[in-house]
Curated annotation (Swiss-Prot):
It comes from the Bacteria. Belongs to the phospholipase D family. Cardiolipin synthase subfamily. This is Uncharacterized protein jhp_0176. GO terms for molecular function: phosphatidyltransferase activity. GO terms for biological process: cardiolipin biosynthetic process. Residues 162-189, 396-423 form the PLD phosphodiesterase domain. PROSITE patterns: PLD. Keywords: Cell membrane, Membrane, Repeat, Transferase, Transmembrane, Transmembrane helix. PANTHER family: CARDIOLIPIN SYNTHASE (PTHR21248), CARDIOLIPIN SYNTHASE C (PTHR21248:SF12).
Length: 502
């Protein structure tokens, strides 16, 4: 067995690292004045008068977030840069792929950077776009083995590299508009999945923050572990499917009636957008992102530093929503100190029944009861949240995916960063720190609404229990709600795993 692993290791190390360093130099990005584009001209006057400010539109609703992406693609004139951790091959993803293809046909330069962990298949529609003359697709830190079922062997042989992923999410249009937040590309991020939908949040920013996001994208795009699709071992087989590009419109599984309705909604969005009918917030926005070299060598996290600084400086309240919550000893000390000063700490995260990572919940449990006893308001998402919130939809489960923090109803940290060791030390992340009280209050109200529909963890006779209101009746649970004994047992077993590796 040892000999087998040694041979496997040599094979993978030679294969993976050889692949990484053969990356050709990409064409330089095109240069233009973003204020002269359709989108840029809409906000040119206000932002040129206040060059230190950025403008923001909050995207709370999943379907609205999809409309913004599609609408921005249709209004684009020069370039689109997309960076994401997950790109599924479902309805929403196919719609966006089709829109990107249409933009490229108009002459828009499109660059797509995907993490290999979140790619459904080398033969997904998004990969086919690489054969268009105006579209480039790269894969970040790819596996040498392209068959997903066999990748566990590569993980054993090259674990230190494979575990480090690009978790950033950026959607940059014409170097002027950028969507930043927690949403990947897939049906369950846009409230369009019948099995599981994610509660999430992102925002559309205009102005200076977009140029900083663009700089970050360029760093990742030129990084030696961003590999062109043309260098993947499956490229020749993928090329055989190149004719499928022309059939993207036909492949989307949607009725003519639904297609017409969607078309109407996109056109309505564009009209409202160009008439400034969406609430717009102006303020100082700081773009924060890890360097891509973080996956090769330990580097400090600018987002973690900004979070800890804002947490220490909070004077009144902090509201944290994080799908994964493993704060660690240092942050727990800050929490304790701030609560002792009378600062209100609210935490919203996943329950055992709503999480998509049982091992992470096992680690969260080490801190959960301590936080309740400290005096923090701790909430866990109910997995039937969506069914109770939106009538007529039949999603069987809902899960928190957002990563948003509001400090003193004034400052908002929004992006891909979870409060856990993986975001701090292993993955690369991106976020924006936005200073606008009205925006912060709107975000807090949204998070508060989620919390009120969730389980509230409270002390009862020195024990932490789950409490919620259902049809006006207060209900209690002594164990993790909506879970089986077997699920709770797996959670207990998972606690043997080291926190830093989760």
């Amino acid at each position: 067995m040892k000999i087998f692993l040694v041979i496997l290791s040599v094979f993978f190390f030679n294969g993976c690292f050889g692949l990484a360093y053969k990356t050709p130099i990409s064409n330089p990005p095109i240069s233009y004045d973003p204020y002269t584009t359709t989108i840029g001209s809409l906000y040119a006057k206000n932002l040129k008068e206040n060059p230190k400010h950025s403008a923001a539109i909050l995207l709370e609703d999943g379907f609205d977030a999809l409309l913004h992406r599609v609408g921005l693609i249709r209004m684009s004139q020069k370039s689109i840069d997309m960076q994401t951790y997950i790109y599924k091959n479902d309805l929403s993803s196919q719609v966006i792929a089709k829109e990107l293809l249409n933009a490229a046909n108009r002459g828009v330069k499109v660059r797509i950077l995907l993490d290999d962990n979140g790619l459904d298949s080398d033969f997904s529609d998004i990969m086919l776009l690489n054969f268009h003359k105006n579209i480039e697709v790269k894969i970040f830190n790819p596996y040498y083995i392209r068959n997903k079922g066999l990748r566990y062997f590569e993980m054993l042989a090259d674990y230190e590299r494979i575990k480090k992923r690009m978790h950033n999410k950026l959607f940059i249009v014409d170097n002027f508009a950028v969507i930043i937040g927690g949403r990947n590309i897939g049906d369950n991020y846009f409230d369009n999945d019948l099995d599981t939908n994610f509660l999430d949040l992102d925002a559309l920013f205009f102005g200076g923050v977009a140029s900083k996001a663009k700089e970050s994208f360029e760093n990742y795009w030129r990084f030696h572990r961003s590999i062109p699709v043309s260098l993947l071992r499956t490229h020749k087989r993928l090329k055989n499917n190149v004719k499928e590009i022309a059939k993207l419109h036909e492949k989307i599984p949607i009725s003519a009636e639904d297609a017409n309705e969607f078309e109407k909604k996109v056109n309505d969005f564009i009209e409202r957008f160009q008439k400034y009918q969406y609430p717009i917030y102006y303020g100082n926005a700081i773009f924060l992102a890890d360097l891509p070299a973080k996956i090769d060598t330990p580097l400090y996290s600018p987002i973690k530093i900004a979070f800890e600084k804002a947490l220490k400086n909070a004077k009144d309240s902090v509201f944290i929503a994080s799908s994964y919550f493993i704060p660690g000893k240092k942050i727990m000390k800050i929490f304790k100190n701030q609560i002792s000063k009378g600062i209100e700490l609210n935490i919203l995260t996943n329950s055992l029944s709503s999480t998509d990572a049982i091992v992470v919940y096992g680690a969260w449990e080490r801190y959960r009861n301590k936080l309740v006893r400290m005096g923090a308001n701790v909430y866990e998402i109910r997995n039937d949240f969506f069914n109770r919130q939106i009538k007529g939809r039949f999603s069987t489960k809902h899960s928190l995916h957002g990563k948003t923090i509001v400090f003193d109803d004034a400052l908002t940290l929004l992006g891909s960063f979870n409060i856990d060791p993986r975001s701090a030390y292993i993955n690369t992340e991106s976020a924006v720190l936005f200073d606008n009280p009205s925006f912060a209050k709107r975000v807090r109200l949204s998070l508060k609404d989620h919390a009120q529909q969730s389980w509230h963890l409270v002390l009862y006779r020195h024990r932490v229990i789950w409490e919620a209101t259902e049809e006006g009746i207060l209900i209690h649970e002594k164990n993790s709600p909506d879970t089986s004994f077997f699920l709770r047992l797996i959670k207990e077993w998972s606690k043997v795993l080291p926190e830093r590796e989760l």
